[in-house]
Amino acid sequence: MTKQDTTDKLWGGRFTEATDAFVERFTASVDFDRRMYHHDIRGSIAHATMLAKVGVLTEEERDQIINGLREIEAEIEAGAFEWSVKLEDVHMNIEARLTQKIGITGKKLHTGRSRNDQVATDIRLYLRDEVDVIAAELLRLIAALADLAEREADAIMPGFTHLQTAQPVTFGHHMLAWAEMLKRDFSRLADCRERFNVSPLGAAALAGTTYSIDRQYTSELLGFNGPAENSLDAVSDRDFAIEFCSFASLLMMHLSRFSEELVLWTSAQFNFINLPDRFCTGSSIMPQKKNPDVPELIRGKSGRVSGHLISLLMLMKSQPLAYNKDNQEDKEPLFDAIDTVKGCLKAYGDMMPAVSVNRDAMAESARRGFSTATDLADYLVRKGLPFRDAHEVVGKAVALGVSSGRDLSEMSLEELREFSADIEVDVFEVLTLEGSVNARNHIGGTAPEQVRAAVVRTREWLKRNTEM
């Protein structure tokens, strides 16, 4: 491992005694913030390039710094870099190593910069890269749901309210409901990215710097939309972390609801779908078990992400301007939320294309639950009955079905006419599952024709949003 001198703090000139050993460990963040090494180095290269442009560094000094930073990045990626708790964080570790490698020139890098604007820049760069990965995974899952919806556009299942059979719907329509939620999540993520893509670099500690820096130039080098307008806000703002975790919490809430349905549907009591074996596990004692661990775990992980949102809100509550050490606590919840969301989206993006559907079980479940009762009421309304009277008539017919163990479609015309003389032989056209779903043939409806049209619109949306 590459050694570096850690006997003196880079900020130690004002102090007369060494940091307490426990406090040194307690206040260090290098164990978790070193994942931002690439972004820290990228920000430093941009800063050094700008310092040379404005005449603070010579071109030779700039090149020394940039080459040294790239060598350090290679050391880190090769596992040859020794991280030190004594140096507190990713920034000081890299700067100390740079000075060790290139000498006094390395000490010039931090000119016109503070760790306050440095870390704010690093986090935004890191989050931006991760958001782009998450966006791609989100689009992949939406595409998988659209493919599944197209494949099962005419597969009939019971729709539920209160988890009780309500009306027949198509499986494709149900999948597109989840796709709509994820499309809203994507929109929130894109909005979040646009808002946080501003550069804090150059804000320094809190008030800006006395050097004639070019913040617009570093902003462009780093791919930001522009420099942050206010130096105080630039170094103290963590809205972007909160906003990301808000997006993540909503997304995970949606995935949790989706997971609950997958868990139910794989059970013997529903038997609507089958998950591939490679996404399930068995029991250590019960040989017959095939457990839907992936959706169960994703359902459980939603809570930790919501917890991270609350943690960040409470972290920032009551903080005065500008930077406070409290803000070191922003990274672990943010990083874990990022990791959790990426993992969950990848798992479902891989799994959903391989889900198989048990059409017979779904249709039978829809038939058992009197799911066409509303269709019979609508039929009577079209015959001239007020809806409330039709509702009463059908309720009595359902009661007979419950007591006799039959669906409405299994009753004879004579039996049905005992409840209303307006019922005629054409009633059986509306009492079939197919007739029920096909009748809802409008935008947003469950008819197979509408499902296929919605799939086309979803794919057009995907095409428009392949790049944020």
Curated annotation (Swiss-Prot):
InterPro entries, sorted: Arg_succ_lyase_C, Argininosuccinate_lyase, Fumarase/histidase_N, Fumarate_lyase_CS, Fumarate_lyase_fam, Fumarate_lyase_N, L-Aspartase-like
Gene: argH
Family matches, as Pfam families: ASL_C2, Lyase_1
Locations listed in the record: Cytoplasm
Enzyme class: lyase
Gene Ontology molecular function: argininosuccinate lyase activity
Keywords attached to this entry: Amino-acid biosynthesis, Arginine biosynthesis, Cytoplasm, Lyase
Pathway as given in its UniProt record: Amino-acid biosynthesis; L-arginine biosynthesis; L-arginine from L-ornithine and carbamoyl phosphate: step 3/3
Entry GO CC: cytosol
EC number: 4.3.2.1
Record-linked PROSITE patterns: FUMARATE_LYASES
Reaction(s) this enzyme catalyzes, per UniProt: 2-(N(omega)-L-arginino)succinate = fumarate + L-arginine
Main subcellular location: cytoplasm
GO aspect biological process, one term: L-arginine biosynthetic process
Protein name (Swiss-Prot/TrEMBL): Argininosuccinate lyase
Database matches in PANTHER family: ARGININOSUCCINATE LYASE
Family as reported in the entry's similarity comment: Belongs to the lyase 1 family. Argininosuccinate lyase subfamily.
Family annotation (HAMAP family): Arg_succ_lyase
